[in-house]
UniProtKB/Swiss-Prot annotation:
It comes from Strongylocentrotus purpuratus. The lineage of its organism: Eukaryota, Metazoa, Echinodermata, Eleutherozoa, Echinozoa. One of its GO terms (biological process) is protein folding. Cell surface recognition protein that binds acrosome-reacted sperm and thereby mediates binding and subsequent fusion of the sperm and egg. Residues 586-597 have a biased composition (Polar residues). This is 97 kDa heat shock protein.
Length: 889
């Protein structure tokens, strides 16, 4: 299972993967870890990344960038209208009121949604990751700006689905950076100690995001977020471009803003100038050739002048920095450090502004470009069951307050705040309503100053609601949740039904709750009809705590189910016992039958039970429907297939072109003597005709046509190339042949001279070796002589491969014979020294003679001796030998 994190930025994207015990940022086919977030469409194909960015000026109308700012946005949105004026492509309104992007593709006008374009970049990143990992990539984590709304986050998830990815988590940029920072820190305070407060500032291409996070060992908690979604590096580029546009108008009488291509070139040069000023305080020059009307322009600016121009922008930088301090009630001295990331954070004046607010130097311990992607990969590893990661809890927050609204049954509408700004996320809440019929909840952002015109999140209809048997309102429990993606949902709804009870139970059981609606519930019914929810159970804390608390809520409801079931079981057992008692009494006495039945009836009682009905929920949001997502997924698959075919066709065409140029050069150089004059002339003419065909009739042919063309050329060129290669390899092969003959010839000489080393080899076997060697020598000499008669441009008599094959066949015959091991000398059998003492004693014969050392044979059997043993080395003829001889050590 792959563990991949994608950071899709407004200008560029990065891929990080967890493997080898760490996090690695991946490079693309250009050996660059940065992939431009650009998609370009042409008459024949589409391109993404670096190839698309190269067409940003020449094909600007069909090259889409900065699409991230249009996801799930209305065309009428003021910020959309503002961005539409600065992008070079055409923005249109879709039938649903959202933004569409119009381009010319394959000769037709096509309109794509921002989600589709986002998916195209994800497709490119996915392909790069799969090439690096050599496996399929499905699960991933994707970063989004912290200010993204519910619909925008849903749009990113849909884009991942269109690209064939399973997005495990949508994580805020600054939260991902904080995770990448904190998980490797070994010096964080313990959970019991005061947390370490760190500020993260992400200044990217189009936005500024600030976050304050509290760190303890194994725990990260986001305290506050603030951002300016319209302040980034591109705003400084526009500032410089406006400055030079006025300068060129004054000095050259040239309006570069009237020409889109000239303006794009100026913007690109201003970006380079801005980066140079970040590293140099000297005067920076800018030169653009043929910017417009075949005229060159130049300009100069210093860092001081640039900072003076950007004074208003730098003031805006202070706003979110001060905002997070106000939200958290922290002082600058409470901040441990300030970590800056993002390409635009390299601007010196931005660093100075941050330093002025927090009264601390900025820290750059994180990789400013790759930190977000690395945090995403870490989050994916935490969520993946195949990776073991150090325990680290992440508690994020909701960027905007959320409220619920509903229509009252008696004309008065109701509302309540579900979560406040900076509420911990994910979280769940259980709400209680009293209704007789299905009803609808409307979720919206509560802040009227929200930077988006449409504050509604969605509508959620609770279906299947019915009144009680008494005609009163039923108790409805609704669970709302903001999940790990930061997306709001009505997770579940259930109706609590109280089943009716018998009159006897009402008399025996005095509990008002069991006998019917209590006073509180009775008043609650009317109160509910006036739209006051009767119960809400807020859940705070991290992901684990929120889930646990939500489960407790649900378990409380399920507990009532189990209690009811237990009481039913008890009632059933009681009834069964009474019945058995009744049967026994009826067997004993018929007269007691009526009395027993009366007792059983009195004992039989049914406690009031509670039954829970799960209710269906119909959610209506402005996100893409399932059908639309499936259609876009199929269309993306067709685009990928078309791109693959186009690439294969271009590769085949390039192969033909490359072969033509290569062979034309070699025919006059390396291959000159390996082809006849006549053949060289005809082949050169064919190569020239093929080149002309490529740029005329063959400019746009199918892959098979190009393959046929190159195969026809190789029929002529390959023999020439083979003759060249054989001429290089053949002398070495003959030399190896001669070296292989030497040991066999030497062995034959030694054998003929009677060398002891080979005396064990039979004459017939050595004759085989001699015959084989003579045949191979004759074959070599004949081939060498025949090859010497051939001209270089003629096909060779023998190839290097054939020579090596002959060497192997010779070794196959000769090696087993000459390497035959000499047999070992035969071992002599042991001499017979007569019977052992034990055998001699059995047979009653004389004892055997002594050994060479003068010692007699010993026997260590357990039989008791019958006499003294003779001394070692002495033999007395007249002395009788004992039955057993023993020698003690």
């Amino acid at each position: 299972m792959s563990v991949v994190g994608f950071d899709v930025g407004n200008l560029s994207s990065y891929i990080a993967v967890a493997r080898g015990g760490g996090i690695e940022t991946m490079a693309n086919e250009y050996s660059d870890r940065l992939t431009p977030s650009v998609v370009s469409f042409g008459e024949k194909s589409r391109t993404q990344g670096h190839a698309a960015r190269s067409q940003a000026i020449t094909n600007y109308k069909n090259t889409l960038s900065q699409f991230k700012r249009f996801i799930a946005r209305r065309f009428s949105d003021p910020s959309v209208q503002k961005d539409a004026k600065v992008v070079p492509y055409k923005i249109t309104q879709l039938p649903n009121g959202n933004v569409g992007m119009q381009v010319q593709y394959l000769g037709e006008t096509e309109t794509f949604t921002p989600e589709q374009i986002y998916a195209m970049i994800l497709t490119k990143l996915k392909s790069t990751a799969e090439i690096n990992l050599c496996r399929k990539v499905v699960d991933c984590v994707i970063s989004v700006p912290q200010y993204y709304t519910d619909l925008e986050r849903r749009g990113v998830i849909h884009a991942a689905e269109i690209a064939g990815l399973n997005c495990l988590r949508v994580i805020s940029d600054t939260t991902a950076v904080a995770l990448a920072y904190g998980i490797y820190k070994q010096d964080l305070p313990t959970p019991e100690e005061k947390p370490r407060n760190v500020v993260f500032v992400d200044c990217g291409h189009s936005s500024l995001q600030v976050s304050v996070c509290a760190f303890n060992k194994g725990k990260l908690k986001v305290l506050a977020n603030a951002s300016d979604k319209n302040l980034g590096g591109r705003d400084f580029d526009w500032l410089l471009a406006e400055h030079f546009a006025v300068d060129f108008q004054t000095r050259y009488k040239m309006d570069v803003k009237s020409n889109q291509r000239a303006w794009l070139r100026l913007m690109a040069e201003c970006d380079k100038t801005k980066k140079l000023m970040s590293a140099n305080a000297t005067l920076i020059s800018m030169n653009i050739e043929c910017i417009m009307n075949d005229r060159d322009v130049s300009g100069k600016i210093s860092r001081a002048d640039f900072e003076a121009l950007a004074a208003e922008l730098l003031k805006r930088v202070e706003v979110p920095l001060k905002s997070v301090l106000e939200q958290t009630k922290l002082k600058p001295e409470d901040i441990h450090s300030i970590e800056i990331v993002g390409g635009s954070s390299r601007i010196p004046s931005i660093k100075e502004t941050i330093k002025k607010v927090f009264k601390k130097e900025c820290s750059t311990t994180l990789n400013q470009d790759e930190a977000v992607a690395r945090g995403c990969a870490l989050q994916c590893a935490i969520l993946s069951p195949t990776f073991k990661v150090r325990d680290f809890t992440v508690t994020d927050l909701t960027p905007y307050p959320i409220e619920l609204e509903w229509k009252g049954t008696e004309g008065e509408d109701g509302s309540m705040e579900v979560s406040s700004k900076n509420h911990q996320a994910p979280f769940s809440k259980m709400l209680t309503f009293y209704r007789k019929a299905p009803f609808e909840l409307v979720a919206r952002y509560a802040d009227p100053n929200l930077p988006i015109p449409e504050r509604r999140i969605g509508r959620f209809k609770i279906n299947g609601v019915f009144p009680t048997t008494e005609g009163e309102s039923s108790k409805i429990k609704v669970k709302v949740r903001v999940d790990g993606h930061g997306i709001f949902n009505v997770a579940s709804a259930s109706l609590i039904e109280k089943l009716p009870v018998q009159a006897e139970d009402a008399m025996e059981d005095g509990s008002p709750e069991e006998n019917g609606p209590s006073k509180e519930e009775g008043s609650g019914a009317s109160q509910a009809e006036n739209d006051a929810p009767m119960d809400q159970s807020p859940v705070q804390g991290g992901a684990g705590e929120g889930e646990a608390s939500a489960d407790k809520e649900e378990q409380a409801d399920n507990g009532s189910k189990e209690t009811s079931k237990d009481s039913k079981d008890q009632t059933s057992e009681s009834s069964k016992s009474d019945k058995e008692s009744k049967d026994q009494n009826s067997e004993g006495s018929k007269s007691d039958n009526s009395s027993t039945e009366t007792d059983a009836k009195a004992a039989k009682k049914t406690k009031k039970t509670i039954k829970t009905h799960e209710l269906s929920i119909t959610a209506t949001t402005d996100e893409l429907s399932i059908t639309e997502v499936n259609n876009f997924f199929e269309k993306e698959g067709k685009l990928i297939a078309h791109d693959r075919l186009e690439k294969e066709k271009n590769d085949a065409k390039n192969a033909v072109e490359e072969y033509v140029y290569e062979m034309r050069e070699k025919l006059c150089d390396k291959f000159e003597q390996y082809i006849s004059e006549k053949e060289r002339g005809s082949f050169s003419k064919l190569l020239e005709e093929t080149e002309n065909w490529l740029y005329e009739d063959g400019e746009d042919e199918t892959k098979s046509v190009y393959q046929t063309k190159i195969n026809s050329l190789k029929k002529i060129g390959d023999p020439v190339e083979n003759r060249f290669k054989e001429n290089l390899e053949r002398p070495g092969a003959f030399e190896d042949f001669g070296k292989a003959l030497v040991p066999y010839i030497k062995t034959l000489d030694l054998y003929s001279n009677g060398d002891e080393k080979y005396s064990h080899i039979e004459k017939e076997d050595m004759a085989k070796v001699e015959k084989c060697v003579k045949e191979k020598v004759a074959w070599r000499d004949s081939k060498v002589n025949a090859q010497n008669q051939k001209a270089p441009h003629q096909d060779p008599v023998v190839t290097a491969a054939q020579i090596r094959s002959e060497i192997q066949s010779m070794k196959f015959v000769c090696d087993p014979i000459i390497n035959k091991p000499k047999p070992k000398p035969k071992e002599e059998p042991p001499k017979d020294n007569g019977p052992t003492p034990e055998e001699a004693a059995k047979d009653g014969g004389p004892a055997p003679p002594t050994t060479e050392g003068g010692e007699e044979k010993m026997d260590t059997s357990d039989q008791a001796p019958t006499g003294e043993a003779s001394k070692e080395g002495e033999t007395k003829p007249d002395e009788t030998k004992p039955d057993v001889e023993m020698e003690l050590d």
